[in-house]
């Protein structure tokens, strides 16, 4: 029988971002307790030699698993050091990979206080609402005019240390194409 290959998306990430991600996850799991229910699996708890860590984030009856890797083949640049991350959504026997933006949105539907559009309705009804969003990485669209006005009124409070964002983990110089000036002044286009 021949070898069977399984292809999966792994975002190339430098090791310092992975270290930051791991320490933020551990801080919010054990110190601030904002990541309640999250499970951190160390490299020595995995049977796969390339896995450096796994973070299991319960989302209702599903789970989001952020896996970091080491010892991967390097890319074409010298700073592609063989580190990476993959993001997988699992429910029972079904699993699929998700992109970092969707992962942050999924996390935000279950974790971290938010002043969202539903909060405007609750405030009008006289209910007490959270005055700010702790996890802006979980929003990828522009809010309503009411939301933008209230958000401008209440300045976001910087959380030290920041909450762990999957988008921040995977964004880097080789995952986001560099913006360059076009031939018409300041218009931008993707450069290669």
From Swiss-Prot:
Residues 171-172 are annotated as: Membrane association. The modification Phosphothreonine is found at residues 96, 188. Residues 151-164 are annotated as: Multimerization. GO terms for cellular component: host cell cytoplasm; host cell plasma membrane; membrane; virion component. A motif (HCCH motif) lies at residues 108-139. The keyword Plastid does not apply. Residues 14-17, 74-79 are annotated as: Interaction with host APOBEC3F. Residues 176-186 have a biased composition (Basic residues). Vif-defective viruses show catastrophic failure in reverse transcription due to APOBEC-induced mutations that initiate a DNA base repair pathway and compromise the structural integrity of the ssDNA. In the absence of Vif, the virion is morphologically abnormal. This is Virion infectivity factor. It comes from Human immunodeficiency virus type 1 group M subtype B (isolate OYI). The gene is vif.
């Amino acid at each position: 029988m021949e070898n069977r290959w399984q292809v999966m998306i792994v975002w190339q990430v430098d090791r310092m971002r992975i270290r930051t991600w791991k320490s933020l996850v551990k801080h919010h799991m054990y110190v601030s307790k904002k990541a309640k229910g999250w499970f951190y699996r160390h490299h020595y708890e995995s049977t796969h030699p390339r896995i450096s860590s796994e973070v299991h984030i319960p989302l209702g009856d599903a789970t989001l698993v952020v896996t970091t890797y080491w010892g991967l083949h390097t890319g074409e640049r010298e700073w592609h050091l063989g580190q990476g991350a993959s993001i997988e959504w699992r429910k029972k026997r079904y699993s699929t990979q998700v992109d970092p933006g969707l992962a942050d949105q999924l996390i935000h539907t279950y974790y971290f206080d938010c002043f969202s559009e539903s909060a405007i309705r609750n405030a009008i009804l006289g209910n007490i609402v959270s005055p700010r969003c702790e996890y802006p990485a979980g929003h990828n669209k522009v809010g309503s005019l009411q939301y933008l006005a209230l958000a401008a009124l209440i300045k976001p409070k910087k959380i030290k240390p920041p909450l762990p964002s999957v988008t921040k983990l995977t964004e880097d110089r080789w995952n986001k194409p560099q913006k360059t000036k076009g031939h018409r002044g300041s218009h931008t286009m993707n450069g290669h």
